[in-house]
Amino acid sequence: MQLADAEKWMKEFYEKRGWTEYGPFIRVGFLMEEAGELARAVRAYEIGRDRPDEKESSRAEQKQELIEEMGDVIGNIAILADMYGVSLEDVMKAHQEKLTKRFEHA
């Protein structure tokens, strides 16, 4: 899926459910929640969970969880960017330019 197609799909999906009605402060809260879930998935994948109240998962299940949580983070970033009239393409271009400039003499 191309970035622009993903943005369009996410916007339509979130709008259909009324999830775009939340303001940016609430959206950032959702983003932080999803970032925490991604951190948990990374931990499970890298060092395991060691929790007796959780079932063990296979490496494939752990990787799928990583992918899904990354998607949740990106989805929230895309919706937040859209609130400010910014595309993910714009975000990535600016990020690339910033890093290139910062490290051009390194």
Swiss-Prot record:
Q: Which domain of life is it from?
A: Bacteria
For this protein, the record's InterPro entries field holds:
MazG-like_dom, MazG-related_YvdC, YpjD/YvdC
For this protein, the record's Gene3D superfamilies field holds:
MazG-like
Q: Which Pfam families match?
A: MazG
Protein's name in the database: Uncharacterized protein YvdC
Which species is listed as the source? Bacillus subtilis (strain 168)
The gene name on file is yvdC
